[in-house]
């Protein structure tokens, strides 16, 4: 796992088309913004797990 440190307003780039920006930090919560092409699914982990569980039914 790659571990990075970013400050509010800083961005990291994944591949050529995906950016992840730190929008804010409040207590133990971090707000991030993700820009990705429409064909790339972006989900919170708990939502992704629910989707995968539904596919198995």
From Swiss-Prot:
**UniProt record, GO biological process:** mRNA catabolic process; negative regulation of translational initiation; positive regulation of translational initiation; regulation of carbohydrate metabolic process
Compartments, record wording: Cytoplasm
Keyword Plastid (UniProt): no
**GO terms assigned for molecular function:** mRNA 5'-UTR binding
Against Pfam families, the record matches this protein to:
CsrA (PF02599)
Q: What Gene3D superfamilies does the record tag this protein with?
A: Translational regulator CsrA
> What keywords are annotated for this sequence in UniProt?
Activator, Cytoplasm, Repressor, RNA-binding, Translation regulation
Q: Domain of life here?
A: Bacteria
Q: Which GO terms describe its cellular component?
A: cytosol
Q: Which InterPro entries match?
A: CsrA, CsrA_sf
**Oligomer and partners:** Homodimer; the beta-strands of each monomer intercalate to form a hydrophobic core, while the alpha-helices form wings that extend away from the core.
What does the record give as the function of this protein? A key translational regulator that binds mRNA to regulate translation initiation and/or mRNA stability. Mediates global changes in gene expression, shifting from rapid growth to stress survival by linking envelope stress, the stringent response and the catabolite repression systems. Usually binds in the 5'-UTR; binding at or near the Shine-Dalgarno sequence prevents ribosome-binding, repressing translation, binding elsewhere in the 5'-UTR can activate translation and/or stabilize the mRNA. Its function is antagonized by small RNA(s).
Return the similarity comment.
Belongs to the CsrA/RsmA family.
Protein name per Swiss-Prot or TrEMBL: Translational regulator CsrA
Please name the source species: Buchnera aphidicola subsp. Acyrthosiphon pisum (strain APS) (Acyrthosiphon pisum symbiotic bacterium)
């Amino acid at each position: 796992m790659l571990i990075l440190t970013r400050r509010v307003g800083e961005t990291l780039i994944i591949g050529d088309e995906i950016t992840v920006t730190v929008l804010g930090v409040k207590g133990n919560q971090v707000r991030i913004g993700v820009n990705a092409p429409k064909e790339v699914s972006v989900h919170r982990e708990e939502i992704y797990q629910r989707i995968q569980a539904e596919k198995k039914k």
